[in-house]
Amino acid sequence: MSTTPTSAPETTQTDVLIVGAGPVGLFAAFQAGVLGLKCEIVDVLDRAGGQCTELYPEKPIYDIPAVPGCLAQDLVDRLLEQCAPFAFPMHFSQRAESVSDTTCTNGHPRLLVTTDAGKRFDVAAVLICAGAGAFAPQRVSLPEAAALEDRHLHYAVRDLSRFAGKRVIVAGGGDSALDWAMALRKTAARVTLLHRREGFRAADHTVKAMRDAVAAGEMDFVVGMLGGLQTNGDGALTGAVVKSRDGEQTIPADDLVALYGLVSEPGPIAQWDMDMRAGRIAVDTTTYESSRRGIFAAGDIAFYPNKQKLILSGFHEAALALRKAYHYAFPEKSLVHVHTSNNAALKERLTHG
């Protein structure tokens, strides 16, 4: 009896693999294109945008240079538009699992990266823009919760209009929970903010605004913890059982938005033989290269003294990292800096696609 041998996974060869499709990863892709580098992007989420898309797409951002203010999702959309002329492939719902050293035909060092979906990338450099690492929202730990996810139980607000006319419970005590409770009160039929104690892990002005809204009868605030979720015969949410020192009560609800924060960890990259500091990658600030040749980090995942966790800092880090990555991709060529406005071919590509 003969069998057909299983073929080895196809290996994609490119200059740079960018791990993470958040704002920093998207800007890095644009920078790669400007420099003449080919790149591909891998992200554990199912779409581009990182935390901006997954957790707070409608949250205002005010600290991007030359952009007085925009929503987080708008920033992602603009970055996608900016890098679109280069048409870099993006691979979603998979994470970079392992890396090994290899060489190309001329003997120059390369890296072989494999994802948990079996994709393989032969690259000159890896730029990790994975934010806080692989992350997921902290989920409601009730047995009935899983069946309600995406229909009535949400871990992010992606569209305020989705909750129009609904009774909504927002659970959590951080800035995100308070911000969304305040925003939803203008759309939902009724909003109840649920937190386990009177104190909050949020900015003072946000807490004051919430308490003022409660005092004005615009929303409710309940101290307690989720003890159960109630559904009707169709499996739709009808209410939440809340436990407190005073006993139990049932709060009617059509939707529950649970904003307990994120569970994040570096994931497999922590085993990539790099100097790690508290789950982040230590880098040389002249190039943002890690302790392992050819692997760079930019954005929140990068560690160095006086590091500022700002999107604009990540843009700067990615730009410098890619200039060093260029020398790994083209070791026998010099990178000549040319302003995009003075490069006719590049200008044509960026303006007309």
UniProtKB/Swiss-Prot annotation:
Pfam family membership, one: Pyr_redox_2
InterPro entries: FAD/NAD-bd_sf, FAD/NAD-binding_dom, Fd--NADP_Rdtase_type_2, Ferredoxin-NADP_redctase_2
Note on how the cofactor is bound: Binds 1 FAD per subunit.
UniProt EC number: 1.18.1.2
Methyltransferase keyword on record: no
Keywords associated with the record: FAD, Flavoprotein, NADP, Oxidoreductase
Signal peptide residues on this chain, from the entry's feature table: none
Cofactor(s) needed for function: FAD
Reactions that this protein is recorded to catalyse: 2 reduced [2Fe-2S]-[ferredoxin] + NADP(+) + H(+) = 2 oxidized [2Fe-2S]-[ferredoxin] + NADPH
Membrane-traversing stretches: none
Domain of life of the organism encoding this protein: Bacteria
A single GO molecular function term of this UniProt record: flavin adenine dinucleotide binding
Positions annotated to bind FAD: D43, Q51, Y56, A96, F135, D300, S341
Record SUPFAM superfamilies: FAD/NAD(P)-binding domain (SSF51905)
Quaternary context: Homodimer.
Family affiliation: Belongs to the ferredoxin--NADP reductase type 2 family.
Name this polypeptide is given: Ferredoxin--NADP reductase 1
